[in-house]
Amino acid sequence: YNARTFLLSFPAGETSKTQKIKTFLEEQMLKNNCGRDTLIIALGGGVVGDMAGFVAATYMRGIPYVQVPTTLLAMVDSSLGGKTGIDTAQWKNMIGAFWQPKKIFIDLDFIKNLPLEQILNGYFEIVKMSITSNKKLFYFAEKNLRAVQAKNVAVLKHLIIEGLKIKARIVEKDEKENDDRMILNFGHTIGHTLEKLSNYQLMHGYAVG
């Protein structure tokens, strides 16, 4: 298959999740003659996934994209569910769209290179999910904290799979967050406030946890 590819990147972190960056990405796509047959590959953490998904949702009124999350938090949370968007000066994730990825590819090799703070960032999100929906998973996560810190692949794989099962089950019933899906926002009201007050220096998982 003779596909033409090119790479677009932007500075890491929540402060890049802006209209300015979105416009930059869209303008680069236009310069490269991207059409409705274009496929966006979101290779990165949650911010990359959110941005790529929102661009995909709005570019030429919608083009496909796939998620390739490279952080534990993105693997277990933001890559699944179709929530995309950007932040505003007032609040987080206030402009966006529900736009489902065509595929999600999770490669545990990415975890090997993550710093401990990023591992814990995702771990806290898994704990949050388990508190709301799976007591057994909560005890497993609690019992295996040291294994998580040591990047034990078998333990992390189990946590990711079980966390995704929780989220997938809820999203399948309530894709647009009108009812059951709101439970996934547990801890987010306070968490988003803490992130905002820290000028997004505090990671999402830590704020929620």
Where are these regions (language model features)?
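ATP/NTP phosphate-donor binding region
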Residues: 1-39
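Short glycine/serine/threonine-rich phosphate/pyrophosphate-binding segments
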Residues: 47-54, 75-76, 192-193
